Amino acid sequence: MISSRKTSLHILLSLDNDAAARSAAGAAIEFAALGAGVTHEMSRDFAAAFSAAARLISHRQGETVQRLSCVIDNRRGEVRLELAAEDGSSLRSVPATSPDAWKAISRRVSVLQWKPAHAHGGKKAGRVRSPVNLLMVQKRRGVEAGAAGSRSRRK
């Protein structure tokens, strides 16, 4: 259980305005949420929120979004997505889940970071084509866990 007042699901992606890439990234987010112990319905909320955010991104031509964060704010009782531009400035904040869902999510989700697979020394993945091209790093007491949670290693 998470005792902190604010928890974030950080999805760090270099996003193409490409429907296939957005769809694959949404599937990867859903997979990550399930791997973190979130219910299937809530994981779909995450994926749907990403899809909505991706549509906003595609309507803002000329601006490269480098970071998409899903912020669970217990103080406000809300879950929202925040988009950040290449220069780090905030572009937009959109609702991510229904108000009733944030309590259950905040009990289950620790900080997750998504990065392109090549950021961790693997082959350069280029655009996001499938969930396999992303590596989820779940930090929990010095253990680095894979998306399925089946293998872990000490840092």
Regions found by a protein language model. Give the residues of each.
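Bergerat-fold GHKL ATPase/HATPase_c domain
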Residues: 1-48, 150-155
